[in-house]
Amino acid sequence: MFVLNKFHNILHYKKIVPVVLLSCVSLIGCSNSNAQSEPPKQTNQANQIKQENTGNQSFAKLEKEYDAKLGIYALDTGTNQTIAYHSDDRFAFASTSKSLAAGALLRKNSLEALDQRITYTHEDLSNYNPITEKHVDTGMTLKELADASVRYSDSTAHNLILKQLGGPSEFEKILREMGDTVTTSERFEPELNEVHPGETHDTSTPEAIAKTLQSFTLGTALPIEKRELLVDWMKRNTTGDNLIRAGVPKGWEVADKTGAGSYGTRNDIAIIWPPNKKPIVLAILSNHDKEDAKYDDKLIADATKVVLNTLKATE
């Protein structure tokens, strides 16, 4: 649902009304013919509820069209409006967690420490290694591993980052310290992508993961130099062109991290910068009923369009 801070105007109205009535009674010229006021205009709150219902109907329509389940949470940081659809339901986070793990790495280490070189072997390579497989002989710095993990979704890079943090449980501990009591991390790649219905390991909710991403990129979880580094990696992500990026108008900036897993899981979490406006935090998670289901990136792009159109309608 949306959150709009309009109560100041309501309170101000309540203070003024008695004064107006008193003035009317005390004046002889206040006649019954002028007593009837114009019908009240639709309030912003009513318009908000109307747009929320419209958005929910549109999301449900997309779910039916793509035979999928959607989970959405969006926050316009300029207006504090929110959109929530299945926002408290758990979904496998898949590779979206790579952006959070990179944030945790930045939180735990100095920028100088990121120059530490990590060595690994062919046995350490995971299921998807577009960058790390090229550097087995030389190893990679922590900074290079974070770049590979976030921008190319390199699974070995993610695993090496998790090991540097102390394992999935220590990664989760860092999230707890930040106030995220929902997101769970138990396994490495590629196992973390296999989550069956009802399981909670390696999952989050749209609202929880969006707020944690916001803390890392826009909040106080990291000092500004580290925030800028994480945002830069996400802005230069190479895997998201067909997802949230495909659903925003031309000229808008997007920093995102995608993910995919079993049961047709397809996710994207992002910070979106409209021109001359404050950023929008957006998490779109999705899955299907069948374990071997195929995902369609267009679902995420279409859901993004609904989110942005709904936010625009309630401005």
Where are the language model's segments positioned?
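Mid-domain, small-residue-enriched loop/turn segments at the edges of structured enzyme/sensor domains
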Residues: 160-218
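Conserved catalytic neighborhood of penicillin-recognizing serine enzymes
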Residues: 126-161, 168
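Extracytoplasmic
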Residues: 65-69, 86-88, 96, 113-115, ...
